Design a protein with these regions (language model features):
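P-loop NTPase switch/communication element
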Residues: 13-56, 164
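P-loop NTPase motor-domain active sites and their immediate coupling elements
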Residues: 11, 19-21, 62-334
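Hydrophobic positions on the alpha1 helix immediately C-terminal to the Walker A/P-loop
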Residues: 4
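Conserved lysine of the Walker
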Residues: 1
Length: 334
């Protein structure tokens, strides 16, 4: 499993510049992905804590929704067409917000994002319901906007690879497993229990529903270190601290409580409402442009506006309905 992840990451790093590919790496064991620390492709330092993993998945869902809004604005269907369109316009890729976090501006090129989770079992034990819900949302919708998941586990039980996750992750790889039951859990059929080990695998994808037997490549640790050392010499990573800084409270196998604070007390909340009322539309990208704030802050203000009845709920690519006609209605309670 770990060798396969190293092979996959090295292949991606060889073929993609940091401006084209960003990585979020989750390593509960703290040692498997240590060689990749501080490479320029990382959006955040390698994550080892469950709380930060849930925060990163939550951020990825928000980023997915933001990207769909940008695709709708440009009237394109996927990230490839979007990037071709913005490159033809010659627009910049990103800027830094007031906190120094790198933000992709509206009209800027979108890098692909790959989230790699080295061991799913640890996460599912701590926050199964929320991890499952976030993974399913990303797996269902995020491919068109360039966000991809790589999930790995040494324990392929139904508690870890749930039916919902299986239904939304069509591409699967099985190495040697202990029993026929484990093979069925991964591939929906037996066979992986007969593999020989040392990279011998069965692969199943949406376009290849019948598993195909493949020999995996072997990447040695010193080869990984040479690649990552070279990348670190080229440039430093530009971390986005918002990815892992969202407050999260883990409640075992139950829910995760996201405490965003009272955005009604945000010093820009009233200014944001004024922008929405004047423009008669509401979106995070609009607040980013008009107020020059980061994406996460704009998204939280939009959520608070919806909770207070200032704007209507999201409706696909349609703009949100503005439900008040004046900022004064905030004070009057109308």
């Amino acid at each position: 499993k770990s060798v396969m992840i190293n092979t996959l990451l090295c292949s991606l790093l060889y073929r993609n510049a940091p401006s084209d590919l960003k990585l979020i790496l989750v390593d509960p064991k703290q040692v498997e992905m240590a060689p990749y620390q501080d490479i320029p492709h990382l959006l955040t330092p390698v994550i080892v804590e469950p709380e930060k993993t849930v925060s990163a998945l939550k951020w990825a869902v928000n980023e997915m929704e933001r990207r769909y809004t940008l695709l709708a604005d440009e009237r394109v269907r996927d990230i490839k067409t979007y990037n071709q369109k913005v490159e033809s316009k010659g627009k910049k890729i990103g800027v830094q917000d007031e906190a120094g976090n790198v933000q992709q501006v509206d009209g800027g090129k979108m890098p692909y994002i790959v989230i790699v989770i080295d061991e799913m079992a640890d996460l599912m034990m701590i926050a199964k319901r929320d991890v499952e819900a976030l993974i399913v949302r990303i797996a269902q919708k995020a491919r068109a906007v360039g966000i991809h998941l790589v999930l790995a586990t040494q324990r392929p039980s139904v508690d870890v690879i749930t039916g919902l996750i299986k239904a939304n992750v069509p591409a699967r790889i099985a190495f040697t497993v202990a029993s026929q039951t484990d093979s069925i859990t991964i591939l929906d059929q037996a066979g992986a229990e007969k593999l020989l080990g040392q990279g011998d695998m069965l692969m199943k994808t949406a376009s290849m529903p019948k598993p195909k037997r493949i020999q995996g490549a072997w990447v040695m640790d010193n080869e990984v270190n040479k690649i990552t050392d070279h990348l670190r010499m080229q440039s430093a990573p530009q971390y986005n601290n918002e990815i892992i800084s969202q407050p999260v409270q883990l409640n075992g196998k139950g829910g995760v409580v996201m405490d965003f604070g009272n955005e009604g007390g945000d010093d820009m909340f009233r200014d944001a409402v004024n922008v929405v009322v004047q423009m008669r539309k509401a979106s995070t990208s609009l607040l980013q442009r008009k107020l020059r704030i980061g994406y996460s802050r704009a998204a939280r203000i939009i959520e608070e506006m919806e909770e207070q009845g200032i704007i209507g709920p999201a409706d696909g690519s349609r703009p949100r309905e503005v439900l008040i006609s004046s900022v004064d209605e905030l004070d009057s309670g109308a």
